[in-house]
UniProtKB/Swiss-Prot annotation:
Assembly information from the UniProt record: Component of the entry fusion complex (EFC) composed of OPG053, OPG076, OPG086, OPG094, OPG095, OPG099, OPG107, OPG143, OPG104, OPG147 and OPG155. Except for OPG095 and OPG052, each of the EFC proteins is required for assembly or stability of the complex.
Family: Belongs to the orthopoxvirus OPG053 family.
Intravirion topological segments: 197-212
InterPro entries in the record: Virion_mem_poxvirus_L1
Gene Ontology CC: membrane; viral envelope; virion membrane
Keyword annotations: Disulfide bond, Late protein, Membrane, Transmembrane, Transmembrane helix, Viral envelope protein, Virion
Keyword Endoplasmic reticulum tagged: no
Protein name: EFC-associated protein OPG053
Intracellular or extracellular location(s): Virion membrane
One Pfam entry name: L1R_F9L
Function: Component of the entry fusion complex (EFC), which consists of 11 proteins. During cell infection, this complex mediates entry of the virion core into the host cytoplasm by a two-step mechanism consisting of lipid mixing of the viral and cellular membranes and subsequent pore formation.
Primary residence: virion
Length: 212
């Protein structure tokens, strides 16, 4: 898989931004993880999985940083698509990132109903790349069941939108005409990743990696 070309989606840009924001805050991230990701399931093809522990004691901050990263990345999309994805996920683009979003409320309820104490299972949907290419899917465990739930929801939406190298190499440049070009290219390639599918029940189990 190391010899193939990497196939990137908006989720890759999102997770890079999220990791940068986590690193910028002088809050201990080496605390013992209260929550571990036990399994990652979904539809996988040519997909490499990486689990990164960035456990924080402040679950609210981790959720806020996640929303900030999401808003920044989807700014590359046309407004109609941007708002449609945000609504699907449960984030109000008119609110400040620190506001408690519908997504966060849903994830709080999810964690409470499922009584997640130690091990959490994530369903990330689809992770597929064309032949001769691979996708690197990074899952960041912040040690919060609520934040991990939010990440699960975001990856399902953003991992469907392919990012051509011309866009990746010029980020973060936000000239209006550039954004128009970005929007057109993104729309053209949105369905590229959705055309290649294969079902796999389990991709990762705590302490074990399976590559497809």
């Amino acid at each position: 898989m190391a010899e193939t070309k990497e196939f990137k989606t908006l989720y890759n840009l999102f997770i890079d931004s999220y990791l940068q924001k986590l690193a910028q805050h002088s809050i201990p991230t080496n605390v013992t993880c209260a929550i571990h990701i036990g399994e990652v399931i979904g539809q996988f093809k040519n997909c490499a999985l990486r689990i990164t522990n960035k456990c924080m004691s402040n679950s609210r901050l981790s959720f806020t940083l996640m929303v900030e990263s999401f808003i920044e990345v989807i700014s590359l999309l046309p407004e109609k698509d941007r708002r449609a994805i945000a609504e699907e996920i449960g984030i109000d683009l008119d609110d400040v990132p620190s506001a408690v979003s519908k997504l966060e409320k849903n994830c709080n309820a999810y964690a409470e109903v499922n009584n997640i104490i130690d091990i959490q299972k994530l369903d990330i949907g689809e992770c597929s790349a064309p032949p001769g290419q691979h996708m690197l899917l990074q899952i960041v465990n912040t040690g919060s069941a609520e934040a991990n739930c939010g990440l699960q929801t975001i990856v399902k939406s953003l991992n469907k939108i392919y990012v051509p190298p011309i866009i990746e190499n010029r980020l973060p440049y936000y000239d209006p005409w550039f954004l128009v070009g970005v929007a057109i290219i993104l729309v053209i390639f949105t369905v590229a990743i959705c055309s290649i599918r294969r079902n796999l029940a389990l991709k990762y189990r705590y302490g074990t990696f399976l590559y497809v």
